Amino acid sequence: AVQAAYGFVWLCIGTEKKPLFQLQEYDVAAARRVPCGAYGVRTSPLRGIENFLDMAHFPYVHTGILGAEPETAVKPYQVEWREEVDEIWATECFFTQPLAAPSSPQPQETEYVYRVASPLNAILYKVNTAAEGIIPADVVCLFIQPLSETHIRAHLLMILDDQTSSMTDMVLFQQKIFTQDKPILENHLPLKLPLEKLEIPTKADALATAYRKWLIAKNWSYGVHQNTHRGHVA
């Protein structure tokens, strides 16, 4: 099935089990829809999504923007598998950020809500205290186009309640963040994502752990690192 939505063309090459996820903010006329480009990355599609879901790297990779020392701790948050829509959600996510958005006048504790709408598509809802209330939160979308099991094209889309920043400033803000992530992703070995045993999670990884368990429940194998007890790596 082929479908046009949210400025992209979507393709389902298998049996379609559910309709394309809803993104209601995209249809709000006063909100600003900001396509931020597509980026080739040598990594697994699943690694790309999991990096997007991680807050712990903010102070170290996005220093002075999404985080900064000494505010490095990830506060406990809630994670749930919403079975009625088959999505993973994380709520009550808070992180102190020096520059939460181009329009942010000062550092703030930012509230995040993460939504994994499908294995290769994730959405971040980010409360912008400088916003005017046109939409409940700014929206940052990561749509992964797999080119192979270890090579992706990452598409970024923002839907913002920002009536003051220029389009260029908004795009450059998101591009800077992603280009900081890219070398981390490309040097993260193995490139494919191990779903269990090989990597040890911490409390900050509750969302990533839920994502991996969700993939296991789906018997997902594309882009997954296969590790056997005999030490064979596929």
Q: Where do the model's predicted regions map?
A:
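Short Fe-S-cluster ligation motifs
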Residues: A1-I13
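C-terminal catalytic domain of Rieske-type non-heme iron oxygenases
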Residues: K17-A234
